[in-house]
């Protein structure tokens, strides 16, 4: 393995390991109150339109195969 490949792997490893910590920082308001967070989540769930059939959540085998392959 060449030195530049090793350096690239180390950079990618640290980016994957510690980059997730920075992903949500500074984006939007953070609610610290649990009741407020529950109300916000309920509002988001209510805003999603659904006919009640559950078809918008389930995926067929063909969709899964298309996604992974």
Swiss-Prot record:
Positions glycosylated per UniProt: 25, 27
Keywords linked to the UniProt accession: Glycoprotein, Proteoglycan, Signal
Q: Which residues form the signal peptide?
A: 1-19
| Protein name per its UniProtKB record | Chondroitin proteoglycan 9
Q: Which gene encodes it?
A: cpg-9
């Amino acid at each position: 393995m060449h030195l530049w490949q090793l350096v690239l792997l180390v950079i990618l490893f640290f980016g994957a390991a510690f980059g997730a910590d920075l992903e949500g920082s500074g984006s939007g308001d953070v609610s610290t109150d649990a009741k407020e967070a529950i109300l916000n989540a309920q509002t988001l769930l209510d805003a999603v339109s659904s006919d009640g059939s559950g078809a918008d959540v389930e995926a067929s085998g063909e969709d899964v195969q298309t996604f992974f392959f």
